[in-house]
Amino acid sequence: MSGTHRKVLEVLNGRSLTPPPIWLMRQAGRYLPEYRATRIKAGSFLDLCYTPELAVEVTLQPIRRYGFDAAILFSDILVVPDALNRNVRFEEGQGPRMDPIDEDGIAQLSQTGVIEHLAPVFETVSRLRGELAAEITLLGFCGAPWTVATYMIAGRGTPDQAPARLFAYRHPKAFERLLALLADISADYLVEQIDRGADAVQIFDSWAGVLGEEEFQRYAVEPVRRIIASVRSRRPSAKIIAFAKGAGILLKNYRQATGADAIGLDWSVPLSFAAELQKDGPVQGNLDPVRVVAGGAALEHGIDRILDVLGQGPLIFNLGHGITPDADPEHVAALVSRVRGRR
């Protein structure tokens, strides 16, 4: 993969492009009618993730519709606990559920068979690289150990992930064992995605923002550093984006501490601070997804502010989190058009 003509890769290598490349987190999702039709055909959400033909289709849908500069593998961060036999399921209107894990359960966890369980995901990556135009960057991904662990401890998502925080305070050794195991599995998972054709990968730490300063270093920074070091020890040229949602001022040293090439920013990050972070390397973000729902002047103003402040440096234009199901596909088209119209 030379990747010299793939705009997202160019930015990850430190180049500044005008207009910047654009893709959106959850760009393949429920806001698109074609996605909803494919989702029904799949049966369950996990069946959609594990059926390469359908996962390829939903990955390509937003590329066909909008011509984004990157396609991100359609899967979910919770396929890793699913591969660890945690009985993961997605219940309509309730979000993900799985069997909660305790100290004894953590002691019994094993990496055996995990990568084999994820073979359909790797098949999807291989097929995607064959289907995508040469100029489109293919992104793989995984969940950060802290975020994945929050679901494993509680058995579901919670508003502030208090169950995982409490478990970490009460059982720090068991919790750190869980994070280390997840980091090692995630590194293997990303290496395999890269080997199958992913040009770059992103690590999603969606719940990093609930951690205090000390815990952030221990549970968000260290496991992600471990993943990146492991991937780079085997694939030195790997390009990696790390997204720690809600981390705020703790992002100041996040890139250096983890070794990430680029850092993703949520919409709460002040653009003045984002500009400081951009001096050290590429940034990705950070439009409020609700502006896409709103459309019109609110959408245009949000886009223009980001481009005015960050558009002269290495920027991958994205949202500050995933696009929401109530977004109008026409508003997404307007977003892409406005970003690409910047000169």
Curated annotation (Swiss-Prot):
Arranged from A to Z, the UniProt key words for this protein are: Cytoplasm, Decarboxylase, Lyase, Porphyrin biosynthesis
Q: What is its EC number?
A: 4.1.1.37
Superkingdom of origin organism? Bacteria
Subcellular location, record wording: Cytoplasm
> Which GO molecular function entries does the Swiss-Prot or TrEMBL record give?
uroporphyrinogen decarboxylase activity
* Residues that, per the record, bind substrate: R26, Q27, A28, G29, R30, D76, Y151, S206, H321
The cross-references to Gene3D superfamilies, in alphabetical order and at most eight, read: 3.20.20.210
Q: Which reaction does it catalyse?
A: uroporphyrinogen III + 4 H(+) = coproporphyrinogen III + 4 CO2
Gene Ontology cellular-component terms for this entry are: cytosol
InterPro entries membership: UROD/MetE-like_sf, Uroporphyrinogen_deCO2ase_HemE, Uroporphyrinogen_deCOase
Main enzyme class: lyase
Q: Site described as Transition state stabilizer, positions?
A: D76
Any single biological process term in GO: protoporphyrinogen IX biosynthetic process from glutamate
Under CDD domains, the record lists: URO-D
PROSITE patterns of this UniProt entry? UROD_1 (PS00906), UROD_2 (PS00907)
**What NCBIfam families does this protein's entry cite?**
hemE (TIGR01464)
What is the purpose of this protein?
Answer: Catalyzes the decarboxylation of four acetate groups of uroporphyrinogen-III to yield coproporphyrinogen-III.
The Swiss-Prot or TrEMBL record describes its family as follows:
Belongs to the uroporphyrinogen decarboxylase family.
What is this protein's record name? Answer: Uroporphyrinogen decarboxylase
Q: Which organism is it from?
A: Sinorhizobium medicae (strain WSM419) (Ensifer medicae)
Task: List the gene name.
Answer: hemE
